[in-house]
């Protein structure tokens, strides 16, 4: 296969709709088509190992030719944040207040740190990984939206943080002491947050909404589409677990009326039991649907 531009295919939706199963099925299918695939789950209630029937591990694992899988965990994210930003946070905080290195652990436990760093981690994977596509299984919709909103608020907050720093330290004091590093660090965080937001809206990112043909699922999908569209380019809608019962037909029609012309819509039939393991996942996505998405993404 020739060189391709790296892509991100992300899956969003409420809990229980089958994001992990569908994202895993896509990862397997693309790997078997010769693409180098990195399957990542940022859902801290992990089910990726159950779907793939693999041992739970903190490190990326190669599960078949062309496919590497990684499950993120909250404590791992906190440790990575400390290694990447802990020293910088200490240098900024200690330049203003009389604090010791213990401030790093305090900030690491602050609300929003895990969500913000998770996005940074995925951004860094996109920049540095050698692969054709990252398939990203996100946290359930509420947590996913919170994660995106925190990143936006973090970016906006850092602009104010620079002003606050100048007020606290004093411009004259900064000039006298030459203490410019904290300002540079704060500004570098702001620019990095901007880069992460830009990455999420990048043309190489293809977001997928996953739902089911049920009343509550439909309502959540409509709200999720409206809110997620502010942050990520949603291209596809997968209606999962379709059995074409009477009520389902009504909501399949509502999905089509609501999203036709906005998203490419795909239906995935119900499987009992739910697919588990690579062999079962091979049967989940139709060849026709796979070819259509492949032609759009690549």
Cite the ranges covered by each PLM segment.
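Walker A/P-loop NTP-binding active-site region of P-loop NTPases
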Residues: 9-72, 129, 134, 138-152
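Short, well-ordered alpha-helices that flank and scaffold nucleotide-derived cofactor binding pockets
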Residues: 28, 32, 124, 226
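C-terminal lobe/tail of nucleotide-utilizing enzymes
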Residues: 196-298
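Switch/connector loops and helix/strand junctions flanking conserved nucleotide-binding motifs
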Residues: 47-50, 77-81, 142-146, 245-247, ...
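Phosphate/Mg2+-binding loops and adjacent switch elements
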Residues: 95-208
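Extreme N-terminal starter segment of soluble prokaryotic enzymes
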Residues: 4-8
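A conditional alpha-helix N-cap/helix-loop micro-motif detector
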Residues: 19-20, 115, 186-190, 218, ...
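P-loop NTPase motor core
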Residues: 49-106
């Amino acid at each position: 296969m020739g060189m391709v531009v790296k892509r991100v295919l992300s899956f969003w939706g409420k809990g229980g709709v089958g994001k992990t199963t569908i994202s895993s099925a896509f990862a397997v299918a693309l790997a078997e088509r010769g693409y180098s695939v990195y399957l990542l789950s940022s859902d801290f209630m992990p089910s990726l190992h159950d779907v793939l029937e693999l041992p739970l591990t903190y490190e990326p694992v190669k599960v078949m030719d062309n496919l590497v899988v990684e499950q993120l965990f909250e404590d791992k994210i906190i440790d990575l944040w400390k290694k990447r930003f802990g020293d910088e946070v200490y240098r900024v905080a200690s330049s203003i207040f009389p604090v010791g290195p213990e401030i790093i652990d305090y900030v690491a436990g602050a609300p929003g740190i895990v969500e913000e760093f998770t996005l940074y981690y995925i951004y860094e994977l996109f920049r540095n990984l050698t692969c054709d596509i990252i398939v990203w299984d996100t946290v359930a919709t509420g947590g996913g939206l919170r994660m995106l909103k925190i990143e936006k608020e973090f970016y906006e907050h850092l602009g104010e943080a620079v002003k606050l720093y100048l007020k606290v330290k004093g411009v004259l004091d900064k000039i006298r002491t030459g203490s410019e590093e904290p300002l540079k660090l704060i500004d570098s965080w702001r620019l990095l947050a901007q880069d992460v937001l830009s990455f999420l809206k990048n043309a190489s990112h293809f977001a997928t909404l996953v739902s089911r043909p049920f009343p509550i699922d439909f309502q959540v999908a409509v709200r999720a589409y409206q809110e997620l569209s502010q942050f990520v380019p949603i291209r596809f809608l997968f209606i999962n677990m379709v059995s074409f019962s009477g009520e389902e037909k009504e909501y399949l029609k509502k999905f089509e009326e609501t999203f036709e012309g906005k998203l490419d819509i795909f239906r995935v039939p119900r499987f009992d039991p739910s697919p588990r393991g690579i062999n079962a996942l091979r049967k989940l996505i139709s060849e026709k649907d796979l070819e259509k998405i492949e032609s759009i993404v690549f």
